[in-house]
Regions:
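Phosphate- and other anionic-substrate recognition elements at nucleic-acid/protein interfaces
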Residues: 1-167
């Protein structure tokens, strides 16, 4: 048997959705994985943080960024001092397909697939826009993008509709 050091982290794979998040927890010193459902509110986030802290080990959390639903939870987990990782949506879909032969986006196995990807190190860094002070830049960038698209749309409308009417 191999020695499990006290620094080996607890892994928490989170399948993010609008109302509730499914969490699969794997501790280095435990055989069985633990499943937890967390509603999308602060009280429930605190309950999860308490549970993860109770293992008395470093914690590494990973999830697929889903809309904006992951942001509040990621922020709280970051404040709690946990290491946060991102799982690429494309990599998750390909891995899910390879492991379970399933394309189903709402597969309950998603947390398992995320955990597998954590174990093989197929993760990306997660930079929380609020923590890193890039939130305003991100919002401005989104606004700029929307304005640019509207401008282009209007220009195309003028070119395709109004120009031919008069020339």
């Amino acid at each position: 048997a191999h020695d499990i050091t006290a620094s080996a982290p607890v892994l928490a794979a989170i399948d993010i959705s609008k109302a509730r998040h499914e969490v699969l927890i794997e501790a280095p010193d435990k055989k069985r994985r633990r499943r937890v459902s967390v509603l999308n509110n602060l009280e429930e986030f605190d309950r999860l943080i308490g549970l993860l802290r109770s293992y008395q080990r470093p914690v590494r959390v990973a999830f697929e960024a889903t809309g904006n639903y992951h942001r509040a939870l990621a922020y709280q987990l970051g404040l709690a001092g946990f290491e946060i990782k991102l799982i690429s949506s494309l990599a998750l879909a390909r891995t899910r397909e390879a492991l379970h032969n399933s394309w189903d986006k709402n597969d309950p196995k998603d947390a398992q697939v995320i955990l597998h990807m954590m174990n093989i190190g197929a993760e990306q860094f997660y930079n929380d826009p609020l923590v890193h002070g890039t939130n305003d830049i991100q919002e401005l960038s989104k606004t700029h993008d929307m304005v640019s698209r509207s401008k282009t749309e209007l220009w195309h409308r003028i070119l395709t509709h109004y120009l031919p009417l008069y020339f």
